[in-house]
Amino acid sequence: MRRNVSDHAEKKDKVGVEVLLELPKTLSKSNKKWQLALIKLYCSRTLLNCAKHAIRKPGLFPRSLSYTAIDLDHHHGDDHFKIDTETLNDLVKNKNQEKLESLGGPNGLVSALKSNTRLGINEEGDEIQRRRSTFGSNTYTRQPSKGLFHFVVEAFKDLTILILLGCATLSLGFGIKEHGLKEGWYDGGSIFVAVFLVVAVSAVSNFRQNRQFDKLSKVSSNIKIDVVRNGRRQEISIFDIVVGDIVCLNIGDQVPADGVFVEGHLLHVDESSMTGESDHVEVSLTGNTFLFSGTKIADGFGKMAVTSVGMNTAWGQMMSHISRDTNEQTPLQSRLDKLTSSIGKVGLLVAFLVLLVLLIRYFTGTTKDESGNREYNGKTTKSDEIVNAVVKMVAAAVTIIVVAIPEGLPLAVTLTLAYSMKRMMKDNAMVRKLSACETMGSATVICTDKTGTLTLNQMKVTDFWFGLESGKASSVSQRVVELFHQGVAMNTTGSVFKAKAGTEYEFSGSPTEKAILSWAVEELEMGMEKVIEEHDVVHVEGFNSEKKRSGVLMKKKGVNTENNVVHWKGAAEKILAMCSTFCDGSGVVREMKEDDKIQFEKIIQSMAAKSLRCIAFAYSEDNEDNKKLKEEKLSLLGIIGIKDPCRPGVKKAVEDCQFAGVNIKMITGDNIFTARAIAVECGILTPEDEMNSEAVLEGEKFRNYTQEERLEKVERIKVMARSSPFDKLLMVKCLKELGHVVAVTGDGTNDAPALKEADIGLSMGIQGTEVAKESSDIVILDDNFASVATVLKWGRCVYNNIQKFIQFQLTVNVAALVINFVAAVSAGDVPLTAVQLLWVNLIMDTLGALALATEKPTNDLMKKKPIGRVAPLITNIMWRNLLAQAFYQISVLLVLQFRGRSIFNVTEKVKNTLIFNTFVLCQVFNEFNARSLEKKNVFKGLHKNRLFIGIIVVTVVLQVVMVEFLKRFADTERLNLGQWGVCIAIAAASWPIGWLVKSVPVPERHFFSYLKWKKRS
């Protein structure tokens, strides 16, 4: 039956071809070309169909040792890789070990992905793009950021805004009913316009800051990953990872995608971000081989083959349902919220009293209209007029609340933080937590690492000793050189790459590893690939920051376990303590006598005194095939000295911090002699400190002190050598207990506890692990201590800018409240209308905040003492300045309120316009005074802040428009040049007053102590 069907299909195809071949004879020339194309297409399909039927016929092809059957009906895009996306996704998500084995294990999977465990992906052509198209990119779909409309809605949730809108609606309705649409819409419409303007400015400002924080969030998630491509180890963005990539993993790294383990030693993974379990999971070729995106490497090192990226990973699917929280509230914002609430309560009380007084005066008939007639005449007054009058009073009272509540304070903090974060990125500091910006300004102690932070991290081997002799490799026996080759090539996490003959070598790994590899290749003529190919690794003990060493148990390929060799590498004095013999230059193993040991110690000390990092190599034959590496009775191969020069400018940065009252402490893993030499070179240790025996000590000694001894000595310690991450944590805790605000730098995974414990954690962007970065508040992108000093300056600038704005806004709040209250009680009316007060509110909250929040840091900030943990937010200096200016403004404006008409011989409306205009101009001139809390010269550096100048110009222009051209909207009257001159003169008087007031000394004891720094939780 099957044969008949097949024959029938063949006959049918044959007939179809014959018919098509006859068709061109009956067609016109214009259609023949199209018909021929159709024939070609039909023939192609027919031939393929015939081939398919032929292949299916049993017995047609005799079985051979190797044959391939092609199913043309089931072609997929990822057949090029011999495995489909669904299979790959299922592999890791479900830890499908059975499926992995069916693919031939990790090596078979890598082959199916057209990759290589040693060489990685071949990048030639469009291979990377093909993988991205087939398997997807390593990016996550996140919840969309908040749009502008969201912030508009948030602004309208403000109760005072809603009350004002209600008042505006009633005022609009009664105005139109009483005066008609043409004349009656002004009062209510003006309030509507003013409210919508305030809402629009607030929403746009918050929207822009949110976008800014989103951008910074994206930058912080763009981490660098080590991969192998074309046999070359290189660093790429996590977003550029593709399926098939061979990723190199070390302690502290984040796993960038889902994948399988292909090689490595003692790899332990922290999967708590995925499973919630705190226990580390071991990953190996014989057990669990699966690695999840988003997890962290807790110990060991290795390589993984990427199987799924982006949204195909379990982490990606989880992240797609999580929205970024950009509403993080800093400690300062919390304090300002409390301040705003306290002032708001005062404003509410004043507004209630004003409303009460206005209502009493209205209903007792003491208020009069513009014609001099009583506004309320008992039963003869229409109900509409009464309601309209009451609505105006309520609007005035509510507007007083709007002005009284310093809502601009949180906005000022947001603006300052957003501006500072953007500028700090240019200064090589990426802020991860907003609170760090302001807290850094209070820092009293900075605990810094040495390597890469104070030094260039450009290491080079400058000294080497073979036995007790210093010399060149050419004078050393071949046996010693071979042992060095083994000890360097097999006991490293770095790699060597050379693309083709004639090109330079490329070294990867930590700076120390690269220096050692470079020395071994160039001086000892080590062929790393050859050494690796000739030997097998039996067991590895990775570098330990406590023991300061790493080791490997290895053997030659094809040789029994009796020829195992242990190689150790690490801190010279630590390795020396493990040795009982040493190799001399000729390769003879000699017993290490006490005199020899003393001589080696002197060699180490002499190199350390030259600021060299001393690394020793030792070995021993080990016939036992066990996992515990031999740690005693080793033979010392040699000692090398690695030079890591101080960074240019680091001494100046240290001096700047010390001049600013910030104590610098260096915490390093180097020996005490190297640490002392570097500290002197960097300016951390002064000649006086060198005479102090307590200024420099080792971590073990500090660790062994009692808690009372540590607290008593910690402030005098300048350098801690041979320290562990636990020692750093101990020091941070002690300093915090003494009341210090502590900043700590760190780059390793083990630094995470100290970074979290510190008030400000500063991780290194180049050498720092992902664990360290995630535990920190700020990432120093260039690993430079000078950038740490810059962060300190920016921290002080943030705090200083916010204090400037607080002083400026509270001056306005006090003046506006007093003027309206006194006028309402005495005259039964408020000189500043709802629209005018909303305009003042706009000037203060947005334009004023923008002008004062974007001041750049000055060197004067580094001449002050640290703010500390208990400093009040509003200082005595600020109280002096704001009360003096507020008193002046209140005095002048009350004179205008009660004597303005007689002094200037003007109408009531012109008098009120004079009050409004003078009040606004006073704030403009007072913004200059607010630029400096202490300095008399408020114009210094003004030309550098174009934004400030621009805002002042815009404010003045808009004020002129409000007074001269929007008189119906703003309820003002036009002023002549003389009246403008009077307003400007009164406002300008705030400059000399500010100059004089700053000459008045203030007591050191604070007027108020309820606004204090609290410890960061």
Curated annotation (Swiss-Prot):
List all membrane-crossing ranges. 148-168, 187-207, 337-356, 394-411, 803-821, 833-853, 874-896, 906-926, 945-966, 977-998
Q: Where does Mg(2+) bind?
A: D747, D751
Q: What is its EC number?
A: 7.2.2.10
Q: Where N-acetylmethionine occurs along the chain?
A: M1
Where would you say this protein principally sits, based on its record?
A: membrane
Q: Please write the reaction equations for the catalytic activity of this protein.
A: Ca(2+)(in) + ATP + H2O = Ca(2+)(out) + ADP + phosphate + H(+)
EC top class, as a word: translocase
Compartments, as annotated in UniProt: Membrane
A single GO cellular-component term on record: membrane
Modes of activity regulation: Activated by calmodulin.
UniProt keywords (A-Z) are:
Acetylation, ATP-binding, Calcium, Calcium transport, Calmodulin-binding, Ion transport, Magnesium, Membrane, Metal-binding, Nucleotide-binding, Translocase, Transmembrane, Transmembrane helix, Transport
Q: How does it sit in the membrane?
A: Multi-pass membrane protein
Disulfide pairs?
A: none
Q: Where is the active site?
A: D449
InterPro entries from the xrefs? ATPase_P-typ_cation-transptr_C, ATPase_P-typ_cation-transptr_N, ATPase_P-typ_cyto_dom_N, ATPase_P-typ_P_site, ATPase_P-typ_TM_dom_sf, ATPase_P-typ_transduc_dom_A_sf, HAD-like_sf, HAD_sf
Q: Which residues lie on this side of the membrane: Lumenal?
A: 169-186, 357-393, 822-832, 897-905, 967-976
Q: Which family does it belong to?
A: Belongs to the cation transport ATPase (P-type) (TC 3.A.3) family. Type IIB subfamily.
Give the domain note.
The N-terminus contains an autoinhibitory calmodulin-binding domain, which binds calmodulin in a calcium-dependent fashion.
Its recorded name reads Putative calcium-transporting ATPase 13, plasma membrane-type
